[in-house]
């Protein structure tokens, strides 16, 4: 279902609307979309601000953490003024300034599997911007069950990666990826991360989400795209569905 754009919105989003093949239809699809952003750290801040600026109709912001001083190096929606606040409230304030037309739904909670699945079912797309292996796996299971597209990003040290899962027949899921590469529980706290790297990966997540929601372009589904910031090189690998995968396999 699409919704009509106001005159103000048509002017605001003009640079997207004039893109050949995107047009008013693509922008109206964005306005009608509901996106769940899980994690309002470096990746989530970058992705959410571009989704808001681009005109996604509703952003649900899910995180249970509060803003700390060490976050401010890379989490661009937060500031000194919001130290100690829940990240979802800090992000909501910043996003409302970016685009007042977007409906923002803060979810300051650590949801159990049932509650998380209910949120997934209520949205058109999920952005995995967490650094928590257990939550990543829960998102994958819920998205697979409801066939909700999942855009997953990760960044550590000077390397980032992005994967898109649409759960079509024969396509892999996030668990297939983690079975192949292992589940690295190392976080930025131990290993560090360069600030612009998370912005790069988060922006790519927003771009893939926009493509999926609007039907514009070719999403990076069924593969992993890896960015090496030390050499400014991208490489990609095609992913195969693991036949013994606990989530999507035939097991």
Task: Show where each model-derived region lies.
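Adenine nucleotide-associated cytosolic modules
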Residues: 1-251
């Amino acid at each position: 279902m699409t919704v009509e754009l106001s005159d103000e919105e048509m002017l605001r989003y003009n640079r997207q609307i004039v893109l050949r093949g995107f047009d008013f239809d693509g922008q109206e699809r964005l306005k009608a979309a509901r996106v769940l952003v899980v994690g309002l750290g470096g990746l989530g801040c970058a992705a959410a601000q571009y989704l808001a600026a681009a005109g996604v109709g509703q952003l649900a912001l899910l995180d249970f953490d509060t803003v700390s001083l060490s976050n401010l190096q890379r989490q661009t929606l937060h500031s000194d003024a919001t130290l100690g606040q829940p990240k979802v409230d800090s992000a909501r304030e910043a996003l409302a300034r970016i685009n007042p037309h977007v409906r923002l739904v803060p979810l300051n909670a650590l949801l159990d599997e049932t509650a998380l699945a209910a949120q997934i079912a209520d949205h058109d797309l999920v952005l995995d911007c967490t650094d928590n292996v257990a939550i990543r796996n829960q998102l994958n299971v819920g998205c697979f069950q409801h066939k909700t597209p999942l855009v997953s990003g990760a960044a550590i040290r000077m390397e980032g990666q992005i994967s898109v899962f649409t759960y079509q027949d024969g396509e892999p899921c996030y668990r297939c990826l983690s079975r192949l590469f292992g589940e690295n529980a190392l976080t930025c706290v131990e290993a560090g991360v360069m600030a612009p790297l998370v912005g790069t990966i988060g922006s790519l997540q927003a771009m893939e989400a926009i493509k999926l929601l609007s039907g514009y372009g070719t999403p990076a589904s069924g593969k992993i795209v890896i960015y090496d910031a030390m050499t400014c090189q991208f490489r990609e690998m095609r992913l195969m569905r693991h036949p013994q995968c606990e989530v999507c396999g035939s097991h």
